Amino acid sequence: MSSVLSEYTIGGVKILFPCRAYPSQLAMMNSIMRGLNCKQHCLLESPTGSGKSLALLCSALAWQQSLYGKQLVDEKSDEKEWKKMERVTPCCCSCHLKNSDQTTFSSDRQMNSTDNAPSNISGASSNKTTLASKLCAKKQASFTTDQDDDFQTDRKRIRQSHDEQLQARKRRCYEKGVQFIDDDDDDDRDHVKFDSYNQRRASMDSCAEEAIAASSNHSAGPCSLCFCGQTKEEDKATEKCKKENGEKPKVPKIFFGTRTHKQIAQITRELRRTAYSSVRMTILSSREHTCVHPDIHSNRNERCKELLEAKDGHSCRFYHGVHKMNEQSLLQYRHGIDKAWDIEELVGLGKRLRACAYFAARELMQGADIVFCPYNYLLDSQIRESMEICLENQVVILDEAHNIEDCARESASFSCSDEQLMYARDEIDSMVNHGIRVSDHEPLRAVCYSLTNWIRQCSDQLVEREYEASCKVWNGKEILSIFHDMGITNATFPLLKVNLAAVVEKEEKITMFHGQENVIKIPTLSPQSQMVLKGLFLVLDYLFRQNNRFAEDYRVALQQSYTWTNRPDIPDENGFFARPRSRRSIRQKIMVYTLNFWCLNPAVAFSDLSSNARTIVLTSGTLSPMGSFSSELGVKFSIQLEANHVIHKSQVWVGTVGAGPKGRKLCATFQHTETFDFQDEIGALLLSVCQTVSHGILCFLPSYKMLEKLKDRWMHTGLWENLERIKTVIKEPQGGDKTDFDKLLQMYYDAIRYKGEKDGALLIAVCRGKVSEGLDFSDNNARAVVTVGIPFPNIKDLQVELKRKYNDQHAKNRGLLPGSQWYEIQAYRALNQALGRCIRHKNDWGALILVDDRFRSNPKYITGLSKWVRQLVQHHSTFNGALESLTEFSKNQQQRMQMSSTNCDDEPSQGTSSSSKNTSPTSSLLEFTVHPTQSVSEFTQPTSSTQSSVTSPPEIAIPFSPIQASLGGTAPRDNAEVLSHWKEEQRRKSNTSIKTNLMKSFEKSKSNYSKQRTSFYNYFKSNAHTSTPRQSSSKTRESNLEICCNELASGYSASANSGSLSQGFGRENNVSRKQDEGLNESCQEILCNAVPLFHCTNKETHASVSPPRKYVEPSVSMLPEDNTDTDITIHCTPELYDDDGQENLVSDEEDKCNEEKENKIDSGRADKDTNACALDTSVKRENLFHKEEYLNVSGNENAFNIGRNKGTEQKNRENRLSRSRNKGVSSFFLD
């Protein structure tokens, strides 16, 4: 997608999109706009990687901003209307007439009291106001007089109209500054004859001030003679609405819910990309993620509440700093968080400001336009109450909502053990005994006693279901009768709610002690007891709501089980033998009773959202099958969408495998999975896939039980060891700490990123586990996903069994799905969620392998898959056929990926320095081009280019050949052969062998053609600058050499198609000398550009990547003679890599010795006289030499010096080191 900002207008709303939208994104935004504008609910499925989160954010926020824009326009229009109403002539009703006359009289008195005012202006103003009052009085008299209008003379009616026109004309003149001398006194006297006016005038003369004080009362009263009464009523309603909504109608907030906090972090990263990144936002999270107190590491919820209550006299100092970051303006303008932020940024800011991030995020919700939170914050009524979340007339978006049914059922359910109930009972009993809020605690104590006694009575009625597990189930009506016997009814439950609210409320009591106030905090119940009581009352609230409407949706189950606990081993005081000290505790099996209130209808909890929210949007990549959401949630989704994927069908391999490598049928039912044949066949299949597909592979199993069985079997047979030889094998843990899980994930990512002897990693996980939900395995992190079987829920689970029976019971009257169909849908959603871990963006590719014969034999299992998966699925009857197809797919995609990595690199911009790292052009033909200066260009011919008509400086294109010669053979002629050849060489040979071949190729080039020096060499020599490399470790130097090798290898793989390498590379003697010199020169430029230790800066000449052009081989006649024998070696100071005391080792004698050796090598004579320059060195000197030799391989010397004879180099450097050391040694040691 392009990075250019795109603009779309959908539903009358302008949407700014950060890139060109996919068709699926446009379809999603269209559906969301329809739902928001029409207040309808949406059910939208878009495959993972199709950009649904971006579409959700941009469309919802654009709609919200459009409402703010409309609100601003309405406010401006209202102001204009009010201004127009103020300019209109005053109302002619009695109340306004009296107010107008009083205002006139007051103004007359003010004008009379002002002596300096001009008389003409005063008279005009007074006359003007008086005339207006008189006209209003006359009009009022026409309404109040007993005479009919038909009996009035025509002259008076015409006179009235004339006066109105005259007064209007005068008002306009007054506004222009014109002054009048009124001569219509006779007319004024005629108007005074009206009785109504005389009465009002007399009253104003007698008590002017009282009339002014009473004018407001008359003007505020209702009036039936004009429209002002209706206007006042509307104004009162508007003012009331403004007061209720905070001075202006509120724009709906957007509550964006996801399943985990990690998904919230991904959403905020997407929001940062958009044009709406500066939106006012907040993230609601738990104390576990936001607490910044350094002394609290565990049980943060309880410890936070204790610090807030300050039971030990010390309160939380971070809580008192919330005001530093509790407003949106503070974040944006003072602290610089002006774009979408993550919860980690808020926590970091809280630590810096010593302010609580948990309470700051809650305070920021008041002014936020979009609120991010896990969606159980929206479904659970207790969390909504504690977080003060109001969803009335708000927009609710639930992403990754494929598990929303299960989450809704869990939020309306409650479970507790008999031990928890007895703990709450004893604590309440203690409160009553100490006389603390006795009237409120006693009813709650009675409830706890009743439940614990009932559990003890029913313990003998339990029915055994399996080994050491018994239970009994009651339906809604039965449990209501049981609660009625306990005294908990529709009438008494509201009173119990009042008692619970009173006991959990904090209270302080002030007493006087020795004349001083003493504040005593009244004790409250512990958080554990409060949690038990609140959960119990939550269920009771649903049971008694709306005349027991949801009673049939509940089942109450009492279960008996056994668990192992660690109990301290207390020695017997009367015991004769002493026990060992190391024996601290003993494990003991105890019986546990669990009371479960299970909600079987998700619509119970979801009804709070559907009845209050303006629009609900459910979206996920795996909503299919979508038919159950409307019936299960009790919400009509008027807008539904099932979008297509954005990838091409060639980027994904989807196949079903029904047989293993040995031909055994694979059907992952409970009976088959218990056999060793099935377990061995699955292991052999997984091993073959690991050998075929490189990088990361995910394998999903139906349950943790099956995972443990397979691991034990494979460890016994040695297959687990075989898997570890190919890939790093990681197993998903069941439960455990979050930090441990994150470490395992990081281990998996690192094994793929830093591949050594092993080719990636294998992660074996479980459907519905942590790995299958919301984690991003893009690109190499998941090149294949293997699913074994169909992850049906445990059919023996009591809750699953009750849910199936419930659906069968209410399928006809409520439209629910039958129990068997609901059971299958749960399996499909879990399977689709696991398959969605692969293919995370448009350019991604991967294989989806479904291992189970049921997919091939029964088509109904294919219909449950996502739309984009079932369109591409292929059935393979044998494993060999599937493996061949998978191998071909993997090779093709790897070749395409390598080609796209070359094609997708950015072209270098104009003016790029030659010292920067070169990037590949958009074609597979790679050529390094030397841009000569004007002095050199006169010896060259211009290069013809068929791809560009823009005139460019003369250039000489120099392709690579040393690497290709080192890797052997004739150059491949097409891209596929080049890439496959390089891939095989790279995997077959280690890095050491590649470096050896590189040095050999340069050695050949140097030994054969070192005497042929051209003007290019002189030019580079004259412009080369020496630079001092920085000191680095051997590991860094090795990585730099690998960078150089990769650059040269990429040039080899690309230059093979240029056509200029059609000659055999094994015949070096037939290659043109000038061409080989050009090759050496290009390699020199590569070493300068690729290895960051060296900086070959040239002001006029630089090496850069240019578009492909025809190769022009420079002829000898085009180049001037080179009369200089000086070497063009790029000088670097090797002493920086020696010890601190070994500085300044190079001397004039060493240079002479080097020149003599070079002359001998250039003349082709054997180097036999170098022994005269060599001295014996110690072990320390040999180590120093090895360091310098390694640096020379990395580019410390000229490209030609890489091929220098090793024996000559060793003796030469030994001589240099020994001589320099002798110079630096004190004469005391030399004597």
Swiss-Prot record:
Report the cofactors. [4Fe-4S] cluster
Give positions of region: Disordered.
104-126, 147-166, 890-924, 936-956, 1195-1231
What's one Pfam family the UniProt record gives for this protein? Answer: DEAD_2
Subcellular compartments: Nucleus
Q: Provide one Gene Ontology cellular component.
A: nucleus
Q: Does Zinc-finger appear among the keywords?
A: no
Task: Quote the cofactor binding remark.
Answer: Binds 1 [4Fe-4S] cluster.
Q: Where is the composition biased (Basic and acidic residues)?
A: 152-166, 1206-1217
Q: Where are the transmembrane segments?
A: none
What this protein catalyses is:
Couples ATP hydrolysis with the unwinding of duplex DNA at the replication fork by translocating in the 5'-3' direction. This creates two antiparallel DNA single strands (ssDNA). The leading ssDNA polymer is the template for DNA polymerase III holoenzyme which synthesizes a continuous strand; ATP + H2O = ADP + phosphate + H(+)
| Main EC class the enzyme belongs to | isomerase
Q: Name one GO molecular function term.
A: DNA binding
Query: PROSITE patterns, from UniProt?
Result: HELICASE_ATP_BIND_2
So where does ATP get bound?
46-53
Q: Does the keyword Nucleus apply?
A: yes
Example of a GO biological process term: nucleotide-excision repair
Domain Helicase ATP-binding: start-end pairs? 11-448
Query: Would you say which domain of life the source belongs to?
Result: Eukaryota
Comp. bias intervals (Polar residues): 890-903
The residue numbers the entry assigns to motif DEAH box are 399-402
Question: Bias regions of kind Low complexity — which residues?
Answer: 909-924, 940-954
Its domain description in UniProt is:
4Fe-4S iron-sulfur-binding is required for helicase activity.
Could you say which protein family the record assigns here? Belongs to the DEAD box helicase family. DEAH subfamily.
What is the recorded function of this protein according to its Swiss-Prot or TrEMBL entry? DNA-dependent helicase and 5' to 3' DNA helicase required for the maintenance of chromosomal stability. Involved in the repair of DNA double-strand breaks by homologous recombination. Involved in the repair of abasic sites at replication forks by promoting the degradation of DNA-protein cross-links: acts by catalyzing unfolding of HMCES DNA-protein cross-link via its helicase activity, exposing the underlying DNA and enabling cleavage of the DNA-protein adduct by the SPRTN metalloprotease.
The name this protein goes by in its record: Fanconi anemia group J protein homolog
Name of the coding gene: brip1.L
